[in-house]
């Protein structure tokens, strides 16, 4: 007997349809699994065998060959357990092969026949829809992701027996109801700009960075509020669109970081890796490339505190994602490109001791130490940071006041208005904010006659030279 069942796996952050071919023929009992399976897939043989027996379905004691096509793609994860089991039951005439057309099966099997949760289900459902499938069967624990994709029927199953009874028409399941992704987009943040005392210049700079999507570096002594301000940057960014929310949710589903309580990521990501992070953890890597912090921060904020403490080689890896909005990772087995459009928010002390220019403490560093500290950040990387501001210590009179600062919601309203103006202006060239403009867009849209502070050509040229405006 021969059967073909549709399954799904992941490659990078995208789903890939797999054709599971099962052949049961006469011969000594054996179970061969071919088609470049990873270790988790090879181990499915024992899980499938135990799940069938413990669900009261016979396991064929003959020669079994399972091929996972395309054979040149490495198959990762345990989500192919279910289609392999369905293929074996089809060969055993438990299921009718004609009723399995255009149906995709995703899930890991436990030894007692239950169907366990797998990572990356959202990407798999999206790929199944793109490939023309009509129905997808997923674990019950992945139901939240199944509600997000319209145009395809998604069923959840808890056990192998429940699936078989549905496919045989004995116990009909109903498809998951579809969910409007943005219906609950009223995010409640636990931090707010209203908590920040003083630092009016820094607050204004972060508002400009949020409005234009610009990267920013804050330099100041310890305790001046750099980290506090950075953690509130995400609260003034515009709400994510449906496409952005789905893209971020897909990434977090792949790496298994999707919050249990949420079906979709509505809050923009805020990632703050420690300065000891490796290059592969920051950009992504592994024998089969997986997303790193720059991809987990996609459509959000990547905060690098104590910037000079990071390894120089690690920081240099940020050049490509900051320039292109994506990161390419090449390995022997695969080459992947991951999205990485984020706002870089970095913070550092002005010197090794942290008190250069401080109004209270005296700096104890030698000039050579200060110069060496500043050289830890290369010129090419600094060129890619759009805004650099110096923060001073907040006066005690500002700290003791009970008056709250402007709330994040009020700042966010202005940011949203600014983004809408940019999107309207830049829609024709396919970009969304000022930070994404290239040389041609700057030449096309930048009208220097509107710069009122430049009342003469000489003053304008001197200003441009002073801020090191580059041709690229």
Residue ranges with predicted function:
Residues 40-45, 58-60, 67-77, 289, ...:
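Basic, amphipathic alpha-helical bundle interface domains used for macromolecular binding and assembly
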Residues 1-217, 221-224, 265, 330:
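Peripheral, non-AAA+ core regions of ATP-driven protein-machinery
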Residues 220, 284, 306:
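The Walker A (P-loop) glycine that initiates the GxxxxGKT/S ATP-binding motif of P-loop NTPases
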Residues 217-259, 324:
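Walker A/P-loop
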Residues 170-208, 212, 239-294:
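P-loop NTPase nucleotide-binding/switch module
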């Amino acid at each position: 007997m021969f059967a073909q069942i549709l399954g799904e796996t992941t490659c990078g952050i995208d789903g890939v349809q797999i054709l599971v071919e099962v052949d049961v023929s006469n011969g000594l009992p054996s179970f061969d699994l071919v088609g470049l399976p990873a270790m988790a897939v090879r181990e499915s043989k024992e899980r499938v065998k135990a799940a069938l027996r413990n669900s009261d379905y016979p396991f064929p004691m003959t020669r079994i060959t399972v091929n996972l096509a395309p054979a040149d793609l490495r198959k990762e994860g345990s989500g192919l357990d279910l289609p392999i089991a369905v293929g074996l039951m089809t060969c055993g005439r438990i299921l009718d092969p004609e009723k399995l057309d255009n149906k995709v099966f995703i899930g890991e099997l436990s030894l007692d026949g239950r169907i366990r949760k797998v990572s990356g289900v959202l990407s798999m459902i999206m790929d199944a829809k793109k490939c023309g499938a009509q129905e997808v069967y997923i674990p019950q624990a992945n139901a939240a992701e199944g509600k997000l994709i319209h145009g395809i029927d998604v069923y959840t199953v808890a056990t192998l027996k429940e699936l078989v009874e549905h496919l045989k028409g004995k116990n009909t399941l109903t498809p998951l109801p579809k969910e409007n992704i943005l219906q609950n987009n009223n995010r409640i943040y636990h931090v707010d700009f209203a908590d920040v005392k003083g630092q009016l210049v820094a607050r204004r700079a972060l508002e400009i960075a949020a409005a234009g999507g610009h990267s920013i570096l804050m330099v100041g002594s310890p305790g001046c509020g750099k980290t506090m301000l950075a953690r509130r940057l995400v609260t003034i960014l515009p709400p994510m669109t449906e496409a952005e929310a789905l893209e971020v949710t897909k990434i977090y589903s792949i790496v298994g970081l999707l919050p249990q309580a949420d079906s979709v990521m509505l809050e923009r990501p805020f990632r703050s890796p420690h300065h000891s992070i490796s290059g592969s953890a920051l950009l992504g890597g592994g024998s089969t490339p997986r997303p790193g912090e720059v991809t987990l921060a996609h459509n959000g904020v990547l905060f690098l505190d104590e910037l000079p403490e990071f390894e120089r080689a690690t920081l240099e890896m940020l050049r490509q994602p900051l320039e292109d909005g994506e990161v390419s990772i090449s390995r022997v087995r695969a080459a992947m490109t991951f999205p990485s459009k984020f706002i870089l928010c970095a913070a550092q002390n002005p010197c090794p001791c942290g008190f250069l220019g401080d109004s209270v403490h005296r700096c104890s560093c030698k000039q050579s130490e200060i110069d060496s500290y500043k050289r830890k950040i290369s010129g090419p990387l600094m060129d890619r940071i759009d805004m650099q501001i110096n923060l001073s210590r907040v006066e005690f009179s500002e700290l003791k006041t009970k008056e709250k600062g402007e709330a994040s919601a009020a700042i966010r309203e202005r940011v949203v208005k600014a983004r809408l103006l940019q999107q309207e202006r830049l829609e024709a060239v396919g970009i969304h904010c000022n930070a994404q403009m290239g040389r041609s867009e700057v030449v096309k849209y930048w009208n220097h006659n509107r710069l009122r502070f430049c009342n003469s050509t000489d003053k304008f040229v001197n200003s441009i030279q002073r801020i090191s405006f580059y041709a690229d």
